[in-house]
Amino acid sequence: MLKSSKKEDSSKKNQNNKLIFTVRKLFSPIKNFFRKTKTPDNFFGVIKRLKINSQKMTLDERNILANLLELEDKTIEDIMVPRSDIAAIKLTTNLEELSESIKLEVPHTRTLIYDGTLDNVVGFIHIKDLFKALATKQNGRLKKLIRKHIIAAPSMKLLDLLAKMRRERTHIAIVVDEYGGTDGLVTIEDLIEEIVGRIDDEHDQQLDSDNFKVINNSTIISNARVEVEVLEEIIGEKLKNDDDEFDTIGGLVLTRVGSVPAIGTRIDISENIEIEVTDATPRSLKQVKIRLKNGLNSK
């Protein structure tokens, strides 16, 4: 996902150094294997053999190998940030206007730029380019700061996307649907986290602490993208059937209502559960309040 850029540069450098050391250590036996043998072998076959003979590996190294194996079958659709969660800026935005807006909130490291609508993404800007332009008192529009992105389909394999990003020398891919509209985005950080696991920074930790809060015995505040299984585990009640196509609490609400309900709408999910919409846009749910009529101890 798009990351916060302040106060975390040094910690990310340390994480990157550890990542490089671990990856080098892991891939050393793979390199040696291909040097010693002339027999054609599948890359993932080698990794599977390494995983089997991994007694000398640490838990982190084993986890990375396991993630690499899973990566073989994963597609962009599995990890992309959905359109409703994309933060973007209009191409016509003035640099001075943007500088005023970022004083009020933590800026992203990279932000998409669109012309007209989000279906026409023209590229992205890096926050360091913006700060440099502001420091040198460059006036005008964002156009001269725009960097290129790549286009990808939801069905594209993650390894293919990683290779394409490397060839094109860019860190952002816009995911488009069959009609050419913007469906989501994937960043290089998303791909790295699929291999090494989630890399938290201070901003992520703050977001996580607000994602799912048990306020008291009868009230829970939740991000709409939290998995239904999390709520089921807390309350001890089954909310999703095997044939249901949703995975999140927001999906549960949308399935019951049939559309995006307005803020303040209350939906009876079961005899014990009522969900109130506390934050939403015309296209998606953001946050809900879950009321347990019989309390958490009812299970």
From Swiss-Prot:
SMART domains recorded: CorC_HlyC (SM01091)
InterPro entries: CBS_dom, CBS_dom_sf, FAD-bd_PCMH-like_sf, FAD-bd_PCMH_sub2, Ion_transp-like_CBS, Transptr-assoc_dom
MF terms in GO: flavin adenine dinucleotide binding; toxin activity
Name under which the protein is recorded: Hemolysin C
Record family assignment: Belongs to the UPF0053 family. Hemolysin C subfamily.
Signal peptide bounds: none
GO biological process: killing of cells of another organism
Keywords carried by this UniProt record: CBS domain, Cytolysis, Hemolysis, Repeat, Toxin, Virulence
Disulfide links within the chain: none
Domain annotation CBS: ranges: 80-142, 145-202
GO CC annotations, alphabetized: plasma membrane
One Pfam assignment: CBS
